[in-house]
């Protein structure tokens, strides 16, 4: 099963992306026929060196690193891709529980991970049960995949308990910004990726 803290799968995925289809081709070779939301193929890549806050220099194509050539890739909304993947998973029998977050790791008697416990619902600001109280559920699993982001509280607990960072370089984090720009339609070129 999948526990999704958002109201629906994809609710917290705001990013657009340039999407390479290799993994999708392997999972769902008929993804086009199934209506995957990959509708805008990349037609060109432009890369600019920003000289200052007013001017940039376009890098010639022959100087563009191979990894920045997006031929065969698509410009997508990752929220839409995640929603579509959820539909495919449900069609294969995967149970998805939107609106629930994993609040605790469920450990087996031998100390191994045995699943998660979802958060209690129907509690007030002080954490006291209201009339609508529903205790968290124990979701037991042979395998548990934690996908809560780069600095999730359960991940931190597991890193500490199993000493996963022992002898490793510390993780580094940066702040990213997501913006939606309104631009003059005359300046828009469908399928153009600008770096």
What are these regions (language model features)?
Residues 1-56, 63-195:
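Residues forming the flavin
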């Amino acid at each position: 099963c999948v526990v999704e803290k958002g109201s629906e799968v994809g609710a917290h995925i705001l990013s657009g992306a340039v999407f390479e289809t290799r993994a999708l081709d392997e999972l769902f070779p008929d993804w086009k026929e199934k209506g995957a939301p990959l509708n805008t193929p990349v037609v060109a890549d432009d890369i600019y060196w920003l000289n200052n806050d007013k001017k940039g220099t376009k890098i010639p194509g022959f100087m563009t690193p191979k990894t920045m050539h997006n031929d065969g890739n698509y410009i997508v909304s990752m929220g839409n891709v995640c929603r579509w993947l959820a539909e495919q998973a449900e069609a294969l029998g995967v149970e998805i529980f939107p609106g629930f977050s994993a609040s605790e790791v469920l450990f087996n008697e031998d100390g191994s991970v045995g699943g998660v416990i979802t958060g209690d619902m129907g509690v007030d600001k002080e954490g006291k049960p209201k009339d609508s109280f529903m205790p968290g559920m124990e979701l037991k699993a042979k395998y548990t995949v934690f996908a809560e982001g780069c600095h999730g509280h359960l991940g931190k607990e597991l890193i500490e308990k199993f000493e996963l960072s022992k002898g490793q370089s510390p993780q580094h984090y940066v702040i990213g910004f997501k913006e939606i720009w309104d631009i003059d339609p005359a300046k828009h070129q469908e399928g153009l990726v600008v770096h």
